[in-house]
Amino acid sequence: TYDMQSPCVSVRSGWVAVGDYNGNLIYDISQDGTSKQIDTNLPVKSLSVAANGVVAAILEDGDVTWINVYNPTGEKAVGIKTTMQKSGYPVSVSLSDNGKLMMVAYLKAESGSMKSIVSFYNFDEVGQNYTDTMVSSYEYSDTVIPLAEFTGTHTAYSVGNNQFMLYEGNEIPKNIFQNFMQEEVQDVRSSGNYVAFIFN
């Protein structure tokens, strides 16, 4: 049993990652019941698990926010340093099914208005040729994107307060679809290649 006040939970195939919001521990649990405890040493703000047990977490560290990636043994494999001034504040993180790609939605203030940035990271060979393994990035002015999520190994979506985007790519994901919405989205659900919206 796990005693948590405000749990963050991510489920993918046969894996579940769970950690207390602002807590320092993440439990990476496989379908057969084995569990690995990950000590982040920093408060957890959000997390995501891949279908192979790889875990990504957004961690608060004062003026710096870290996005760390841990392998199923609990060891840190990647650490990405972000600041509000340079990259913006990461509000959502998601791993592809195979754990090789990661998408992050950032919120950034610029010239008195807010914009969102959706960035993709490639932890495979292709990503080694890019700074911080960031292989593609897309900006959306006057938009707040609280949700960015992979739906497989190479397909993903993001939802903002006024628009919806689709992305695709095995190595360098591209924004293949963008649609502005007139109604306010109340909830979003995804399954495989399908995304469903509930409007107010």
Predicted regions and their residues:
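Post-signal peptide N-terminal segment of secreted/secretory-pathway proteins
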Residues: T1-L42
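Short loop/turn segments immediately following beta-strands, especially the blade-tip
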Residues: N122-Q128
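A short beta-strand motif characteristic of beta-propeller blades
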Residues: T1, D32-D39, K76-T83, Q128-E139, ...
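Repeated scaffold domains used in trafficking and secretory/extracellular systems
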Residues: Y2-S13, L42-A51, K86-L95, S137-T151, ...
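Intrinsically disordered, low-complexity segments enriched in Gly and acidic/Ser/Thr residues
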Residues: G160-N200
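Structural motif
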Residues: N24-D28, D63-V69, E110-N122, N161-E168, ...
